[in-house]
């Protein structure tokens, strides 16, 4: 195995609503995430006076970021993916003037990263938006939100033009099909036509952000971000193959629009077959032509699909509701572990788009135990990440242009799906439990030293292959 390229970016990925805390500090407004105390897979509910949402404090990154950045630098990070809390900059979402205290926080954060030699990769909207835009406008169902997002994007592009050169528009933009409130600010029971119209507005907003970035920051690069939910046919029946193709198109459609600049023909048919009419203006079509510079995505699992709906209805284990693959093992949360699938996905996306790729989320959520001596022996995490990185290396050998790899949750954080601390991803243990109890003390896990060695050797310390099929 060859070393990873010298230009390859190594690091980790976080999200503001899962690490920052300080949910109303320094003028921050209420975000949609603040109304999801049980996570993406829970229900939206009003704030209950005196009842704390675990994300209100999260891991207190807002106040402890210097300590955390120092730990990331100790591992050798060259890149850290973070998100800006939109409601920290525009508390209601529709203000003309931004909240200076919110802007100043990210100035301090980016300065700290620069001193540590870590490049920021910044997501504009990661599973949240100002709740004011939902309450007063109806979320992304309202075309007016496009303008408010563009104003926000232009504001942060201008403010951080000398500090940030890598941007992403919307985190896992295709998740709106599975979690409409999280993705586009719509009620979970919203109809399919309403969801796709809101998605259209978000795609236009993404393209406008790309256009603004290219205009204001000609040296910067801006990408999209997809949930990489690769689907296999359950059997070799042609009907299952066709069903898998259609399921993969459901999420790749977002990338097709963002990378190719127009709606693909298969979606036109989908809309016709489902009696969906997308209200699209001529200016929308022109805006969509502003395509992303690179494709970024998350990768956690694969699954199977069948043409037999009775089999599909019994799918379990995650928000994507894919049928378990009998040849794969699963995590404690039912997420199937498929390192080879990452190589397949990388090649699939490269063949489809011929644009640089960036793996901006990948990791293993697991329950960690603190030993009597205070150590955390997370060999299972090391095995998971080792085998996925081996496949990334194989994809590079295949000729795929890969910019970098940021593992999800380099430090334990509040999980998105169920707002749990017990579902841990990090190389760094944070002393906090699901009830919000704990000192928030940071402790290096065994995987901390392992990842540092991987980065130092540019992958030459990786070993083939430790996870085997049952």
UniProtKB/Swiss-Prot annotation:
<feature type="active site" description="Nucleophile">
    <location>
        <position position="361"/>
    </location>
</feature>
<feature type="active site" description="Proton donor">
    <location>
        <position position="172"/>
    </location>
</feature>
<dbReference type="GO" id="GO:0016052">
    <property type="term" value="P:carbohydrate catabolic process"/>
</dbReference>
<keyword id="KW-0326">Glycosidase</keyword>
<dbReference type="InterPro" id="IPR018120">
    <property type="entry name" value="Glyco_hydro_1_AS"/>
</dbReference>
<dbReference type="GO" id="GO:0008422">
    <property type="term" value="F:beta-glucosidase activity"/>
</dbReference>
<comment type="function">
    <text>Catalyzes the hydrolysis of phosphorylated beta-glucosides into glucose-6-phosphate (G-6-P) and aglycone. It has a high affinity for phosphorylated aromatic beta-glucosides (p-nitrophenyl-beta-glucoside, phenyl beta-glucoside, arbutin and phosphorylated salicin), and a low affinity for phosphorylated beta-methyl-glucoside.</text>
</comment>
<dbReference type="GO" id="GO:0004553">
    <property type="term" value="F:hydrolase activity, hydrolyzing O-glycosyl compounds"/>
</dbReference>
<dbReference type="GO" id="GO:0008706">
    <property type="term" value="F:6-phospho-beta-glucosidase activity"/>
</dbReference>
<dbReference type="InterPro" id="IPR033132">
    <property type="entry name" value="Glyco_hydro_1_N_CS"/>
</dbReference>
<keyword id="KW-0378">Hydrolase</keyword>
<dbReference type="Pfam" id="PF00232">
    <property type="entry name" value="Glyco_hydro_1"/>
</dbReference>
<dbReference type="GO" id="GO:0005829">
    <property type="term" value="C:cytosol"/>
</dbReference>
<dbReference type="InterPro" id="IPR001360">
    <property type="entry name" value="Glyco_hydro_1"/>
</dbReference>
<comment type="similarity">
    <text>Belongs to the glycosyl hydrolase 1 family.</text>
</comment>
<dbReference type="InterPro" id="IPR017853">
    <property type="entry name" value="Glycoside_hydrolase_SF"/>
</dbReference>
<protein>
    <recommendedName>
        <fullName>6-phospho-beta-glucosidase BglB</fullName>
        <ecNumber>3.2.1.86</ecNumber>
    </recommendedName>
</protein>
